[in-house]
Amino acid sequence: MQPVYIQRIASIHPQGNHSQENNPKVNDSPDVSANRPFLQACEPDYKDIIANATLRRRMSRIVKMGVACGLECMGELSPEKIEGIITATGLGCLVDTEKFLNNLLDNEERMLNPTPFIQSTFNTIGAQIALIHQIHAYNMTYVHRGLSFESALLDAMM
C-alpha cells in the first residue's frame, strides 16, 4: 500500500478557530466560560466561508460547523482534482434527528417540515460540500462513535 499523508486539517473548538492561520480567534476570557456549565466552540463568521445566505440560513449549527471545516480543508483545490469526500462523525446530527422525531410525534405524522429531516441525515455535511462545489465524485459518511474516524481513514487509503 502506498503511503498516505494528511495535507490539511481544520477544526472549530473552544480555544479558537486555528484553521485560519492569519486570524485565529482565541476564547481565553474567564468571563465567557465561567457562566456556562459546558465548553462552547468559538465559531467563525460563516459569511466568509459559506457565501450563499439562503443555504447558510437553512443549515443547522452542526452542519455549518462541518461544512466550514470541510471547505477550509479543501482550500483552493479545483473540484476536478477532488477524488472523493469522506466524512466521519461520532454521533452525527443527533440534535436534528431528535427534533425531527419529536415533530413527527407532536404533529401525529402530518404537516411535517422537511428541513429537520434533511438535516438529520448523517451525510448532510458531505452532501452540502459536494453541492457547493459541484463535486460529482465518491461521497461517503461514516457514523460509528469512536470507530468512524478510523473507518474514514481506511476508506481514504483504499
Label every model-predicted segment.
Residues 139-147:
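Short, surface-exposed recognition loops or helix-turn segments adjacent to catalytic cores
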Residues 147-153:
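Beta-rich nucleic-acid/ligand-interaction surfaces
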Residues 1-138, 150, 158:
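Conserved "HGTGT" condensation-loop signature of ketosynthase/thiolase-family condensing enzymes
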